[in-house]
């Protein structure tokens, strides 16, 4: 079992964007916190659950596409993956590693709101996504 977390704090200077009328503020901040837990059975089959929360400074021009003018988004991510080749038994050589998986992201808030975030009735859950992936390392 593995438990990971991360916090990212980002500051942007937007002097040029503000001069061009693309941002209201000359600087904004963006913060992101993520925590996830993973379990791998025999290093072959894995399940990961992640909670994420992103928030930042409002700006009426930079985030003009949503009614809250905020970048705030939060939700859960679920991932199920398998590693058929990762322990030296690959037909393509001992160093070939392959992981296949599926990932689902469930948004609670998107662009500052759970419902009608864009003023057109869109819900945060309209951005939920499913991703199928293959990861290869050699």
Which stretches of residues belong to each language-model region?
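Outer-membrane beta-barrel pore domains
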Residues: 1-138
């Amino acid at each position: 079992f593995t438990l990971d977390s991360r916090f990212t704090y980002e500051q942007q200077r937007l002097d040029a964007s503000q001069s061009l009328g693309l941002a209201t503020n000359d600087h904004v901040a963006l913060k992101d916190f993520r925590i996830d837990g993973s379990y791998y059975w025999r290093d072959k089959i894995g399940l990961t659950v992640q909670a994420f929360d992103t928030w930042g400074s409002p700006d009426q021009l930079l985030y003009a596409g949503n009614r809250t003018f905020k970048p705030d988004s939060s939700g859960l991510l679920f991932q199920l993956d398998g590693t058929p080749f990762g322990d030296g038994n690959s037909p393509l050589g001992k160093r070939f590693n392959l992981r296949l998986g599926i990932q689902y992201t469930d948004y609670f808030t998107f662009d500052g709101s759970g419902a009608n975030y864009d003023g057109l009735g869109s819900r945060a859950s309209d951005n939920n996504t499913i991703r199928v992936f293959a990861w290869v390392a050699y």
